[in-house]
A protein has these predicted regions:
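C-terminal lobe and adjacent flexible extensions of AdoMet/dcAdoMet transferase-like proteins
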Residues: 207-243
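SAM-dependent methyltransferase
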Residues: 149-211
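Class I SAM-dependent methyltransferase SAM/SAH-binding core
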Residues: 50-101
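A short glycine-rich, Lys/Arg-flanked "PGG" loop and its adjoining helix->strand segment in the class I
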Residues: 126-138
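Conserved beta-strand signature within the Rossmann-like core of class I S-adenosyl-L-methionine
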Residues: 139-146
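A short acidic, Gly/Pro-enriched loop at the edge of an enzyme's catalytic core
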Residues: 103-111
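Conserved class I S-adenosyl-L-methionine
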Residues: 1-48
Length: 243
């Protein structure tokens, strides 16, 4: 069974996604520049609520997109976003399979994988790279997002985000510890405050393997190139893998 890492916090995720897309849209658009869209759809693995789907659609006008999101509540928001936008509704096919079981088109123009690779085992990644590599044209990119953490370590609690909706304030806190090797266990807590008092909290945890772009290139048997380096919290590390 494939774990669903996002159900517990899905109701809050759009606040994270709105901030994330502000720092990732530019690098992703750069990474997709020059893609030959005649070779097939763009496959987005881990589409979340659809913010990145919108970026792909703007960067590559007219190309069909297969947006895969296994988390049911996240996929509900993705489907709502696609359905409410006629420009997306005609182009985006939403599917529920996780990366490990995704049924891929025979050929694809490009692949976008944000917030996913560290959740996969090495065996799962190697299998995925092989399936993608045989479907991509020469020069067709796999655009990947990494955590931007150079090595596994303990991360003390810190606040990642604070937003207000109506009379309530929402805070996103996170911490982490090393589990084994380069695997870190991240613990997140959402606090809902009203009048300065916490009225509700939601917590979840997940494991993430720290990986370098060079490691992914070696696993995939593909060339790797950095598009955008992570730095501050919320700023992603984005790279390209190409045949």
């Amino acid at each position: 069974m494939v774990a669903d890492y996002y159900t517990a916090s899905a109701e809050f995720y759009e606040m994270v996604a709105a901030r994330h897309v502000r720092t990732s849209a530019g690098p992703l658009t750069t990474a997709l520049a020059g893609v030959d869209t005649t070779r097939g759809p763009v496959v987005e693995i881990g589409a979340g609520t659809g913010r990145i789907t919108e970026v792909i659609a703007r960067a590559l006008p007219g190309v069909p997109i297969v947006a895969a999101e296994p988390s049911t509540p996240m996929r509900a928001m993705l489907t709502s976003r696609v359905f409410s936008d006629p420009a997306l509704r005609d182009r985006v096919t939403v599917v529920a399979e996780p990366a490990q079981h995704l049924r891929l088109p025979d050929t694809v123009s490009a692949v976008v994988i944000f917030g996913v690779v560290g959740h996969l085992t090495q065996r799962e990644r190697v299998r995925l790279w092989a399936e993608l590599r045989e479907r991509l044209p020469r020069g067709g990119p796999i655009v990947v997002e990494l955590m931007g953490v150079a090595r596994a370590r303990t991360v003390p609690p810190f606040r990642m985000l604070r937003e207000s909706i109506g009379d309530q304030t929402y805070e996103w806190w996170t911490r982490a510890e090393q589990v084994e090797g380069q695997v870190m266990r991240w613990h997140t807590t959402w606090k809902v405050l009203r009048g300065g008092e916490v009225v509700r909290t939601t917590t979840d945890s997940y494991d993430w393997e720290n990986l370098s772009l060079e490691q992914l290139g070696e696993e995939a048997g593909m060339a790797s190139s950095l598009v955008s380096a992570g730095g501050v919290p919320g700023s992603p590390e984005i790279g390209r893998l190409t045949r």
